[in-house]
Amino acid sequence: MRKLTHMLLAGTLILACSSCGVETTANYQVIPLPQEVALSQESPFNLNDGTIIAYPEHNELLKRNAEFLAEYISQSTGHTLQTEALAPGSEAPKGAITLGLDPAIGNREGYVLTVKADRVTLNGQTENGVFYGIQTLRKSIPAETKATSILLPAGSIQDEPRFSYRGMHLDVGRHFFPIEFVKKYIDLLALHNMNTFHWHLTEDQGWRIEIKKYPKLTEIGAWRDRTVIGRNTEEYDNTRYGGFYTQEQAKEIVKYAGERYITVIPEVDLPGHMLAALAAYPEMGCTGGPYEVCPRWGVFEDVLCIGNEKSMQFLEDVMAEIIDIFPSKYIHIGGDEAPRTRWEKCPKCQARIRTEKLKADKNHTAEDRLQSYCMTRIEKLLNSKGRQIIGWDEILEGDVAPNATVMSWRGSAGGIKAAQLGHDVIMTPNDYCYFDYYQSEDTRHEPFAIGGFVPLEKVYSLNPTASLTEEQAKHILGTQALSLIHISEPTRLQL
């Protein structure tokens, strides 16, 4: 027994020394795994307090990248690395990590990381690529270590993304998250080489972005009097809940994300999922209300009245302010889960159908065409301002707006159809990409989720271009995971 005790103590000491000893070794098996990792037999590079991070003089983006790398290393190791600008034609000193640009690298987001005993060089075609290489280097180092020296194995890493669009979605409509949490969320996207943050800002359960021309959207629409407990039980918490972002806060997020090479795409979901807006401005609904900011989850019959010109003017006014806040090429305008029930009985909507000569056919109702009218009108407005729309795959149920990019969430079928029609597509199939679903079939022992079953293995198995020809596959811009937040705890979302 005494011998066993001594062996256990010795093992414990060995494990302890591995985290607080003189040195530790980096591991290049990171997520996402680089395209090519080739190790050599040379001695490793010794990263320590004396290491300098060098970058080309007058390149402010690479300077910021160097500062990010120094900050990341400091966070995990406690080492304080200095950054240094290199004059044209000069070489970095031995023992330095040098950041640079190389136009010969084939992909604008690609990078090459070369590690030798006396130096590390990290080149990208653009500053974006260098930043992604920094993330690989960062992840190779233990997240927390007290080692005085980090050994980077000698070799070369080459990497580039398969898709130009790599997104993550955050729903702040159902539950609101403060600005500091949104920044942490963006940091997690950066860590995993994501380049797009889809910010879902409006919902039946809350309007989260300040629109100065319509102040009631946040005075009334950002707050609900109660929230259902669980998955649409008859129990409510009877607690007032809400919040919103000012335009200045939204611009702050755009800047924060941009510094990390992440584009923020805002979503204003229309013409459905608008109960929060209707609670603030009931005259924009088909019945005139009264409406309330919705305390439950689901799909609801009350949507914007497309026959009412005030509703269309409202959308155009909102978009005018949205494009002033968000400089992104794309604006997401929803288009999902908009029941036609109210439109079928609404005199104004029926009048619009007649005026615009919207006809039913064997595949579409006149009300389907009415939704297409709405989406196309907003698309024309945004196109005139140099922007393009993204819509959920329901926009395929009428005449697709001519230049629309389709986000396929109800499986992959909508994305396949859109690509076959020549539309650009972002694949977000719920059966692979909904991160708010259960990850175990034993739901009794998992935290509450709205439904579904998406284990990690299935996420990894997604092939976004399956069932498409080579030409059609060119329309698949990339993929995106979604978090439709029926939970309010930030810690669970981060997990």
For the regions a language model picked out, list residue spans one by one.
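Bacterial N-terminal signal peptides
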Residues: 9-16
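Substrate-binding cleft/loops of secretory-pathway carbohydrate-active enzymes
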Residues: 274, 341-342, 390-423, 433-445
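Single conserved hydrophobic/aromatic residue that forms the stacking wall/gate
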Residues: 485-495
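Active-site neighborhood of glycoside hydrolase catalytic domains
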Residues: 295, 301-402, 411
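Feature activates predominantly on carbohydrate-active enzymes
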Residues: 104-313, 317-330, 377, 381, ...
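Bacterial N-terminal signal peptides that target proteins for export
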Residues: 1-8
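Aromatic-lined glycan-binding groove of carbohydrate-active enzymes
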Residues: 413-482
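Acidic, contiguous N-terminal accessory segments
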Residues: 20-166, 383-396, 400, 485
